[in-house]
Amino acid sequence: MKKIALLGCVCAGCLVVVGGETILSDGWQFRLEGETVLRPVTVPHDWGVEKGSLPVGSCPHQGDLPFVGKGYYRRAFDGFTPPEGGRTYLTLDGVQCRSKVILNGKVVGGRPFGYASETIDVTDALRPSGNVLEVEAENVPRSSRWYPGSGIFRDVTVRVCAADHVKPNSLFVRTLEATEASARVAVSFDWRGGTSNFTFAVENPRLWTPENPALYELELFGEKFRYGIRMAEFDPARGFFLNGVHRQMRGVCMHHDLGPLGAAFDRDVARRQLTLLKEMGCDAIRTSHNPPAAALLDLCDEMGVMVMDEAFDMWELPKGDYSNFWAEWHVRDLTEFVRRDRSHPCVVMWSIGNELSEFNEKDPSRAIRIATELTGIVKSVDGTRPVTFGSWKSDPMWNGCQNTVDAFGANYLPFKYEEFSRRNPKIGLVGTETCSTVSSRGEYFFPVVASPITCEEDLVRRRNEGREKMVRGGQMSGYDLWGPHQNDYPPDVEFEYQDRNPQVYGEFVWTGFDYIGEPDPCAKAGGRSSYFGIFDLAGFPKDRYWIYKAQWRPDVPTAHILPHWNWAGREGEVTPVHVYTSGDEAELFVNGVSQGRKQRGPHQYRFQWDEVKYTPGELRVKTWRKGRAWAEDVMRTAGEPVRVARSERRFGKLTFVTFSLVDEKGTLCPHRDRTLSFATKPGTRLVALCNGDPSSHEDFRGTSMTTFHGLLLAIVQGASEGLLPQ
């Protein structure tokens, strides 16, 4: 990280370095309404995942978890008194929801929107010692379309400032121009002397990119702020350019929960998610459908992940309950959201909403009015980034709504890309939500029925086939051919239309990871989490991972076979085999016998052998690229599980331990699941368990869980060797 020292640039000689920012994570006490005893908790905290699942079907779209209720938090503290003339600021990055903040008996803040970050000047409410901070949070039924989490689910921080300091969220660092030879950076901020603006030059700058996320430090009044130097250009005719280089964003949509940890934000878990995505070739996320944790954007800055920063899931018309607060709060919430995030180099686009109910009205005037207002608010705070929204309706492409934003956000509309750009040459286009392919890791159903998709009308036929053939007992087939809604489609379709339309800024797949709630189309069949993820809820890759890796990292040798090869009772029956590879030729072998060598055709993103008959033994694929051997993959029929294999990967304070059921040769056994129980030694804490089964209602915080197709994840704090499977 490079440092630009600008100490004293505003008032040299008056600088005072004070305590800076402190995260209040320990020392909290908590109780739910109806309880009489406070108990210790660590913040961020999510009470909804602490007590296990509600009865199946209680609230499947919120994961059958007890998120509804009212919670009370209390923390006593001394200190944080600023020097003479200084100020102390308290920031609550997210409280789910309808919060009230009380300091020493005085109400100092609160927000109805659970995802809103609130910074409060608490100087006048502080005592020299004996301070008591109280936070109330209340979730009501039907307030969210997915699992929202409960309580103080993001960081609480205190910032102590000298008299001269940068006022909260007033700093705006932006790149005016940048080449490899030089850059000019503009800085503005508010302080007690008013608003200050200045520019400075950087010679031979290291430009921020996903591949090389170089960061600099700006020092003002003794405090350090990070920024990156980069130029993002969005041209409706030519596409997206980062530092002068054309690229299409290879993005995914991300809900805010962290799987078995619920909604309580954890940097190490988020870092793992981003690492897995980047290893696949992903370079962008969309924060669907709400402002993210501020710490997530810090990670994206560090790791090189571009962000479409999204504000709302609804406007005036309801989908949850924020519409009840819209008139009073939307201007303030949107303004402060943009002010908080605008200096992050990772943020490249703003989204003012997703699939708004206003788009369903025949008369578009309400949608046009609101979108125009919101775009104006964003532009008044940050005029450097394009504004978009997400629409799964095609009418807003033509009825005037498209003119309210810089780039139209198309949800599941790849067949409209070319026409839109032709009819709207001055408006950009981005795939804000694509595919919605659903699958359960390791599940495959037969027969495999998938009619071709060559036009929009084919999607209805494919959906009807899928509903009949690809859904069974709360699980979805893993052939990656189907989605539950009318406009959904497999990854291959989006790849083709992105390739055909380089003016499109990129895509954001629905979704990167399975998330708690929205178990479409299995809500009535016992589903608890979604089926949309490229990764399951535990972070294990589904088969789709390899089709994205092959497309997004074409220079990395990749080959992957599906399905697994354990089909006792199907001997001699047709069992189609698909291969995802970055090679351009592939040959499949069953027990050494070739099933044919195939060449990749135009806009072909998978190889298929649809007439293979199941014979136990070995599946092997060999691939080539430009005539040279490229990558291989093997699937073998497994025997009975004889041991539990173990592998682990550490991120910060947490170790993610994978337990695999394997046979005597070490082959994964996806067909013989069993329950694993765990004990711990002193110095080891079992944080959570997850098997990735979207229909499982087992307790994430328990000490036992059933494997799902041979795999189980344990998240451990402390010495991982102290986790002992029984």
Write out the residue ranges for each language-model feature.
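Short S/T/G/P-enriched beta-strand
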Residues: 234, 550-576, 635-656, 662-665, ...
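An acidic-aromatic loop/edge-strand motif
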Residues: 24, 45-63, 112-114, 122-193, ...
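Extended substrate-binding grooves/exosites of carbohydrate-active enzymes
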Residues: 43-46, 50-56, 106, 155, ...
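Accessory carbohydrate-binding/adhesion or oligomerization-edge regions at the termini
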Residues: 16-59, 132-136, 158, 492-495, ...
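Accessory beta-strand-rich segments of carbohydrate-active enzymes
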Residues: 31-33, 63, 68-168, 291, ...
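Short flexible loop/turn segments that cap and initiate beta-strands
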Residues: 211-216, 574, 582, 588-595, ...
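Short glycine/proline/serine/threonine-rich loop/turn segments at secondary-structure transition edges
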Residues: 83-86, 126-130, 144, 201-215, ...
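Beta-strand-rich structural segments
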Residues: 187-190, 219, 577-580, 622, ...
